[in-house]
């Protein structure tokens, strides 16, 4: 949690099962402590692109506040998922192969399945 939140925001990290045995996905969550059960209209799910994991995109402070913190401070229940092979999610075994012999890290169709698992 960044200093500017003054304990107002709750930061949670989860590991959930994906649709593939042995692959877990990391979820980051940020929300205000003073808001009870969030509604579906205020829940946001973020997913990174093909280069960086969610934390390095959405949870890095700029001018002392991250994108996730700003959204949560505004009252949103913010979630960010790392597709397999990124951030705190499980690295598939084929990631150990040399880059010139391996398939793309996580094709879009697989990342879409990971997003569906998180939702």
Task: Say what each PLM segment does.
Residues 34-80:
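Short, surface-exposed "cap/lid" segments of acyl-processing enzymes
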């Amino acid at each position: 949690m960044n200093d500017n939140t003054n304990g107002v925001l709750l930061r949670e990290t989860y590991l959930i099962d994906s649709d593939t045995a042995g692959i877990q996905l990391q979820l980051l969550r940020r929300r205000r402590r003073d808001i009870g059960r969030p509604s579906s209209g205020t829940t946001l799910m973020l997913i990174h692109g093909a280069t960086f994991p969610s934390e390095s995109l959405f949870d890095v402070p700029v001018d002392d506040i991250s994108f996730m913190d700003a959204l949560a401070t505004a009252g949103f229940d913010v979630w960010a998922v790392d597709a397999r092979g990124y951030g705190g999610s499980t690295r598939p075994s084929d990631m150990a192969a040399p880059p010139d012999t391996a398939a793309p890290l996580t094709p879009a169709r697989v990342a879409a399945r990971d997003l569906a698992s998180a939702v």
